[in-house]
Swiss-Prot record:
<protein>
    <recommendedName>
        <fullName>Magnesium-protoporphyrin IX monomethyl ester [oxidative] cyclase 2</fullName>
        <ecNumber>1.14.13.81</ecNumber>
    </recommendedName>
</protein>
<dbReference type="GO" id="GO:0005506">
    <property type="term" value="F:iron ion binding"/>
</dbReference>
<keyword id="KW-0149">Chlorophyll biosynthesis</keyword>
<dbReference type="Pfam" id="PF02915">
    <property type="entry name" value="Rubrerythrin"/>
</dbReference>
<comment type="function">
    <text>Catalyzes the formation of the isocyclic ring in chlorophyll biosynthesis. Mediates the cyclase reaction, which results in the formation of divinylprotochlorophyllide (Pchlide) characteristic of all chlorophylls from magnesium-protoporphyrin IX 13-monomethyl ester (MgPMME).</text>
</comment>
<keyword id="KW-0602">Photosynthesis</keyword>
<dbReference type="GO" id="GO:0036068">
    <property type="term" value="P:light-independent chlorophyll biosynthetic process"/>
</dbReference>
<dbReference type="GO" id="GO:0048529">
    <property type="term" value="F:magnesium-protoporphyrin IX monomethyl ester (oxidative) cyclase activity"/>
</dbReference>
<keyword id="KW-0408">Iron</keyword>
<comment type="pathway">
    <text>Porphyrin-containing compound metabolism; chlorophyll biosynthesis (light-independent).</text>
</comment>
<keyword id="KW-0521">NADP</keyword>
<dbReference type="GO" id="GO:0015995">
    <property type="term" value="P:chlorophyll biosynthetic process"/>
</dbReference>
<dbReference type="InterPro" id="IPR003251">
    <property type="entry name" value="Rr_diiron-bd_dom"/>
</dbReference>
<keyword id="KW-0560">Oxidoreductase</keyword>
<dbReference type="InterPro" id="IPR008434">
    <property type="entry name" value="AcsF"/>
</dbReference>
<dbReference type="GO" id="GO:0015979">
    <property type="term" value="P:photosynthesis"/>
</dbReference>
<dbReference type="InterPro" id="IPR009078">
    <property type="entry name" value="Ferritin-like_SF"/>
</dbReference>
Amino acid sequence: MVSTTLPTQLETIRPGIKAPVKETLLTPRFYTTDFDKVANLVLTLQDEEIEAALEELRADYNRYHFVRNDDFKRSFDHIDGATRLAFIDFLERSCTSEFSGFLLFKELSRRLKNRSPKLAEAFHLLARDEARHAGFINKAMADFGLSLDLRYLTQKRTYTFFPPEWVIYTVYLSEKIGYWRYILMFRHLEKNPDHNIYPLFNYFECWCQDENRHGDFFKALLRSQTALWKTWQSRLWSRFFLLTVFVTHTLTVFERTDFYQSVGLDAKQYNVDVVTNTNATAARAFPEVLDTDNPKFFPRLEACASANEKLTAIANSEAPKLAKFCQKAPWIAVIIWQMICIFLQKPVDAEARRGMVC
């Protein structure tokens, strides 16, 4: 397993302000949606569950959690070289992802305020948490001499349109996979404190509960719309979004093995644990999930990661554009083929097992 080479120098737009990472299929994206359609969602099927999730958000359990303590009042120059670059990359992508959620939720809250007050309040509270997370991570970046200009990101980033149904599927998965990423890393570092190289990780235990609560709200929202779980189309969409999220996660983790090694994690096993747990959690909301126990499942994901490494090496080469295109084509085909094979594997009927899922 070979990690993608990170640049030896980080590009800035002005002193101390890092230039945003180049947009690719793997970088966190900014989204917009059909706000009118969201405003017209009928929630009666899950009214009690949505109200319960809303009460959890109102409680704001982490109101005082994201306060930098004395552990941050020291130099982190010992984190240097490739480890420093990998860690800054991790922080930037995490910050961008959280800020992307903030922008979407803030706009949903604003647009729904006079049309769907309950949803508007929920999105306002979700935006509160995402802004808190993004700001905390951005301050962490400053410990390494850089930060992101979030206003600049707002203005310069490309916005991708997703229908509300896609937003519900993807945000639910994003929050739940975020929960597992944080809690598994926290548990690992709790057992192996020698690998805890930065105090941000100490916040992950409570932090991940924000992700969990956000996911619970989107689960209730998803289950309130029968078209998202009670039709044959919804079964295909569920598998599709699980697949795309898991492939993206696998490619991203394998690209950044240097970072995971720096905190004592085996990137391959970490990916297996995150994907397996997220898939099991998704069975509580989705009508179908992927069969992660299939012996070909993870080898196929890892084949996608290997092909992606080839694509990155080609992209970073000095070959002419036409030559690069020809060299990339077979590796792109490998990724597409492996994804098709995973998608066509026999899924797990979560709806049939609903009463057995904890």
